[in-house]
């Protein structure tokens, strides 16, 4: 049986899947705007390049 986080929606934590979860399609919600500490020009780039997009983007 698949893990509890791999059903319909993966739980997001620290920019990716929750610890212990194995999900190939897990994605954090898009960020509206990157914070000053996050050197990314857009929400798309932030999600791709920032180490922890869920935390560095509000």
UniProtKB/Swiss-Prot annotation:
Chain intervals for the UniProt region annotation (Alpha): 30-58
Region annotated Beta, chain positions: 1-29
The keyword Cell wall biogenesis/degradation is assigned to this record: no
Name of the featured protein: Metallothionein
Residues that coordinate or bind a divalent metal cation 1: 5-6, 17, 21
Binding of a divalent metal cation 2, residues: 6, 10, 23, 26
Domain of life: Eukaryota
Entry keyword set: Cadmium, Metal-binding, Metal-thiolate cluster
Amino-acid positions noted as binding a divalent metal cation 6 in the UniProt annotation, renumbered to this chain: 40, 46, 50, 57
Similarity field: Belongs to the metallothionein superfamily. Type 3 family.
Induction cue: By cadmium.
Binding site for a divalent metal cation 5: 34, 38, 56-57
Residues binding a divalent metal cation 4, per UniProt: 31, 34, 50, 54
Cited InterPro entries: Metalthion_crustacean, Metalthion_dom_sf
Signal peptide segment: none
Function: Metallothioneins have a high content of cysteine residues that bind various heavy metals. Class I MTS in crustacea are involved in the sequestration of elevated levels of heavy-metal ions.
List of residues binding a divalent metal cation 3: 12, 17, 26, 28
Organism of origin: Astacus astacus
Alphabetized GO MF terms: metal ion binding
């Amino acid at each position: 049986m698949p893990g509890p986080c791999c059903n319909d929606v993966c739980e997001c934590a620290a920019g990716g899947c929750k610890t212990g979860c194995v999900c190939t399609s897990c994605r954090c919600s898009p960020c509206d705007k990157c914070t000053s500490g996050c050197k990314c020009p857009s929400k798309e780039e932030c999600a791709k390049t920032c180490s922890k997009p869920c935390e560095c983007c509000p």
